[in-house]
Amino acid sequence: MAEAHITLSPKVTHEQQTDIDSECEITEVDDENVNENKSQEMIQDIPARDREEIENITRTFVELQENYRLIEKIGEGTFSSVYKAEDLHYGRYINDWDIQSEVLKESSFGKEKIPVNEDSRKPKYVAIKKIYATSSPARIYNELEILYLLRGSSVIAPLITALRNEDQVLVVLPYYEHTDFRQYYSTFSYRDMSIYFRCLFQAMQQTQTLGIIHRDIKPSNFLFDVRTKHGVLVDFGLAERYDGRQQSHSCRCTNSNAAELAHDFSIAQETSLGYIKNDTRPSKRANRAGTRGFRAPEVLFKCSSQSPKVDIWSAGVILLSFLTKRFPMFNSKDDVDALMEIACIFGKSEMRQCAALHGCTFETNVSTLTEKRVNFRKLILWASCGSASIYKEKLRHKPSQEERLCLDFLEKCLELDCNKRISAEEALDHDFLYLDNLAYEKKDDDTAFDNSFGETSFEKDEDLTAKHLSHILDFKEQEETDEPTSLSKRKRSIDEILPNDALQDGA
């Protein structure tokens, strides 16, 4: 099958091209030879395995050689690999997606557009995502369609173009300069976090407005540049459509009296624990997509009526990593371990209520788990302080206004009941996301702080608390795959990349 390609982005007009050529002083003397020499030099510097992959991709896609020069592999995941490439014909197209040509810089006075004085002849980069052939046509089609719908946003990586050769699909996305999460998560101030999450929730609000659940919110999928204080949401490989009006009502959580029903259900379960012998009921099925450690409770309990609130929970886990200076915060191997890690913080009582909300039962004989939840502030201080003396000293001080707003925002994001969890739109009205624009007194505010998240106290039972939290607070770094993005042009018809017959064959 021949390569499928249709260019949708407008080409530069003759007058515009004349201006571009004049401004950029473009010269095309021995261009092909220069590009070939550069390509040979770059290929020699990369690992043999990656070099072989790049050569195979280049041979498979003829048009790729004409428009891009693959440089290196920058990411690898379950369903795809990502490569950095140079866009050889950047100046020939209108690149309205290129937000890095005018960087947005955050300041205490709000957003200021800071023009970047770059050499116009400096290489422009893109990220080329190779989707593995094991992905179904329906999954690939869904990702391309969602990327196309989300075009035009400064906080979401858009689709530039896509190529297909038989069962091989390449997606071309912008490449964004960004800082590795591990380099800054332990040093960010409250105001830095405020800017980070304002940008993230702006992206989430835009996806949710279009009825899209990202399903894989995590640091490696939000490319944040510490220098410009701007971030971009990427990787919609697990994203799906959501329509609240057509939402399945098979789960108890969608009932208007869900909380009361869950309470009654949990009480009834206490007197009838056990398994039904020769149970003929069908197994519970639900979308469980996502990255371990970032999946919401309703995903772990296999709720069949999941909403965009699953993304809010994931964002809350990222915030908890910032505050505790622990990453990854959760590091479970399976769903059962994941529920136990959450129970270490929220306690058995609230976990039973949450399970009942989705028609499940939560019971455990782990003696170190407490009935009531751990106070968020105490948890954060305990995890981030280097010693017990420092912890007790900080605990004696009243929290600042910034800290109170941050804790309130955290509590609203990490709400076990998905019906009560804050939405992206509501989050954007929260004062925590605007700390850089608000004036605060340096001294601690004397207003009373609501410390009633739970009565589990580090002073009362510090040894027990440390014991049942130790397995989630003593982490080794989890290897994550960044799947960044780069810079280029040209959008294609999704139907041309994956025609209807291919979609039906893979359905």
From Swiss-Prot:
Pfam families: Pkinase
Phosphothreonine carried by residues: 291
GO molecular function terms noted in the UniProt entry: ATP binding; protein serine kinase activity; protein serine/threonine kinase activity
Primary location class: nucleus
Family: Belongs to the protein kinase superfamily. Ser/Thr protein kinase family. CDC7 subfamily.
Function description: Required for G1/S transition. Plays a role in DNA replication checkpoint signaling through regulating rad3 and cds1. Involved in the maintenance of mitotic chromosome structures during S phase through regulating the function of rad21. Required for initiation of mitotic DNA replication through phosphorylating mcm2/cdc19. Required for genome integrity.
EC number of this enzyme: 2.7.11.1
Enzyme class: transferase
Compartment(s) of residence: Nucleus
Gene Ontology CC terms: cytoplasm; Dbf4-dependent protein kinase complex; nucleus
Lineage: Eukaryota, Fungi, Dikarya, Ascomycota, Taphrinomycotina
Residues annotated with Phosphoserine modification: 22, 493
Residues reported to bind ATP: 74-82, 129
Keyword Glycosyltransferase found: no
Entry PTM: Autophosphorylated. Phosphorylated by cds1 in vitro.
Protein name per UniProt: Cell cycle serine/threonine-protein kinase hsk1
SMART domains noted in UniProt: S_TKc
Active site: 216
